[in-house]
Amino acid sequence: MTAMTIIQDWNPEDRGFWDRSGHAVARRNLWLSIPALALAFAVWMLWSVVVVHLPAAGFRYSTNQLFWLTALPALCGATLRIFYAFAVPMIGGRRFTTLATASLLLPAVGIGLAVQDPNTPFEWMVVLALLCGLGGGNFAGSMANISFFFPSSRQGTALGLN
């Protein structure tokens, strides 16, 4: 398959198809998905680490505000999972993985810039925390994408690695 090939017919349950070409395509997609999902998880959980150090860096947020910054990525990620699960069939797995992974740059770079100034408004931090939820939403899309490629007898291993 070339880089621009669109899968027209995929039947991983057909042993002949799986042995001929299916396993190679599935394996390639899995190994590309694993680092993308690791990055998504890192961005999603970033606030759990950042919040602990904000007071020492001079940020004067209340305890309540710090808890909100920690909770918002999970709330946003849980909501986005609904939409991301349907995105893969609509736009394609390769395009989804590329766009979803690229979208993680915005919160990652944003946090890197925001934590340099203790006068960063709390509202900006809330926006960045919500954007980190993109990482959580990536999980649903990634699982839907990878499970499509493997026969049911191998989906558990693939999803576990992913």
Positions of predicted regions on the chain:
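Loop-to-transmembrane helix entry/capping segments in MFS-fold secondary transporters
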Residues: T63-N64, S152-N162
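Juxtamembrane helix-start elements in MFS-like secondary transporters
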Residues: Y61-T70, P121, M125
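Cytoplasmic membrane-interface "Motif A"-like loop-to-helix N-cap segments
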Residues: P89-T101
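Hydrophobic core of transmembrane alpha-helices in multi-pass small-molecule transporters
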Residues: P107, P121-G137
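C-terminal ends and interior cores of transmembrane alpha-helices
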Residues: A102-N119
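Intracellular juxtamembrane helix-capping segments at the cytosolic ends
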Residues: G137-P151, L159
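Central cavity-lining transmembrane alpha-helices of secondary-active solute carriers
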Residues: W68-F86
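Extracytoplasmic
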Residues: R28-Y61
